[in-house]
Amino acid sequence: MDELTKKVLNSFAHWRKETLDLHELFEAGGNDPDARTAVFDIVERLVKEGLLAEEGNDFYSLTDKGKAAAKEV
C-alpha cells in the first residue's frame, strides 16, 4: 500500500471523525496539487474496493474492511 493511501485511511483517526468530507481527505496530499488529484483517485479506488463508503454530498466513511486496513498501516 502506498504512503498516500495510508494517509487517506489514517485521516479518520487524525481528524477523530467517523465521516470526512473530500476536502478533509485532500489534506492527506498537503498543498501539492498533483497529490490532491491523486487523493481524489485514491478515494474513488477505495470506494470501489469497499474500504470507503460514500455517504453523499462528498462525505465518506470507513467500512469495516477499511477500518481493518487502517489498523494495519
Model features per residue range: what roles?
Residues 32-48:
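Short amphipathic alpha-helical interaction segments
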Residues 47-57:
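A short, conserved structural fragment
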Residues 67-73:
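Short, amphipathic alpha-helical interaction segments positioned at domain boundaries
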Residues 32, 66-67:
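Short, intrinsically disordered, low-complexity terminal segments
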Residues 58-64:
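Minor-groove-contacting beta-hairpin "wing" of winged helix-turn-helix DNA-binding domains
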Residues 1-31:
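Short amphipathic alpha-helical interface segments
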